């Protein structure tokens, strides 16, 4: 490794770093790429070799800001990840494989999706891990100064992305396994050993609420006491659910750009929202909150509803809006036997919420399940294949509702009118009736195909059967 001459102040910091880490590290034998190391909740700066005269500065939370030649800047923050020679094998396997195994459990969306989709939207790059010594590696994230400069982001949000969590009841087992590894127990495959530990311990129990968390293999080295102990909000991006904690929500949202579809869900007890382990990824649509394990801890499981939905046409396109009304009616017809024969914990309700240019067609349910969402998607897919004759019964049912709206409209002397506009004038319920009559199987097929082109997303979790709002479409 290249030798770097460091100031006395930096060497003093590194001696403190070495002491806290419990390893003997020569401060002059550190890789060029290492910049900030966090140990026991404290940040230790390691001077970065100046290249091309670039200026650097360190913010209060340890983020290093590098000023570029063009006047711009880039921010970097490094997290230390320590315990056992197994990390050398992790490094060789590459960050993608490591994050995949560390963050994937029961179908949780893979790290590739996290790094390529979510982090890109936030303007964040995760660099290849750097081996600090034989038993520690450092992950560096790089992004915008305004993003990484926020203490809430640096201390909590990025840790929740980079480090898997163990529930309290599994901490003892984790420590036992790590202790075995620290004694340099000979193993044929260290990486397989890591996978085994993660699959046996990660995300089990109830990783929620007012409980302490221990990042995998961290055991205090990254100041577990400062990790979050309660969930505040859920951020959904397409088919990935990223769980934030009690941080500055608006600050995080501001760091996410363009087309991210943000769905927020708040529970009445302690601001608790769904944990990462209760989501599953897989084929791209399979995102669902397994509500029972979550609800039992905080609220009455029989009165809390979870709603997930597909993006659908809004009200600005009359033809597609009418087709969406028929599709929603067909889905409702499909679940009506369940509505009629099941008791409260399995109650389902299909909804279509239409706004100006976008809408939601989804399913609200008590005790939502992964299988339920798959069945809902399958029903939606089948509707896209219906013939004109088969579609007729669903059009008739949609017309019954539309005619009911017409009668209400007439009874109030046309003061209740539909709110969307295609020609500059408000559209009346009579025009919606005409549009439903004109819906064709081809139009339904086209709308369904577009809906299935984007994954389902959690849009509501709370006391009411269904209350998704425009906030879910931001």
From Swiss-Prot:
SUPFAM superfamilies: LuxS/MPP-like metallohydrolase. This is Ubiquinol-cytochrome-c reductase complex core protein 2, mitochondrial. Its main location: mitochondrion. PANTHER family: METALLOPROTEASE, PROCESSING PEPTIDASE ALPHA SUBUNIT, PUTATIVE-RELATED. Component of the ubiquinol-cytochrome c oxidoreductase (cytochrome b-c1 complex, complex III, CIII), a multisubunit enzyme composed of 3 respiratory subunits cytochrome b, cytochrome c1 and Rieske protein, 2 core protein subunits, and additional low-molecular weight protein subunits. The complex exists as an obligatory dimer and forms supercomplexes (SCs) in the inner mitochondrial membrane with cytochrome c oxidase (complex IV, CIV). One of its GO terms (molecular function) is metal ion binding. The keyword Transit peptide applies. Belongs to the peptidase M16 family. UQCRC2/QCR2 subfamily. GO terms for cellular component: mitochondrial inner membrane. Residues 1-42 form a transit peptide. Pfam families: Peptidase_M16. Component of the ubiquinol-cytochrome c oxidoreductase, a multisubunit transmembrane complex that is part of the mitochondrial electron transport chain which drives oxidative phosphorylation. It is a peripheral membrane protein. Keywords: Electron transport, Membrane, Mitochondrion, Mitochondrion inner membrane, Respiratory chain, Transit peptide, Transport. InterPro entries: Metalloenz_LuxS/M16 (IPR011249), MPP/UQCRC_Complex (IPR050361), Pept_M16_N (IPR011765). It is found in: Mitochondrion inner membrane.
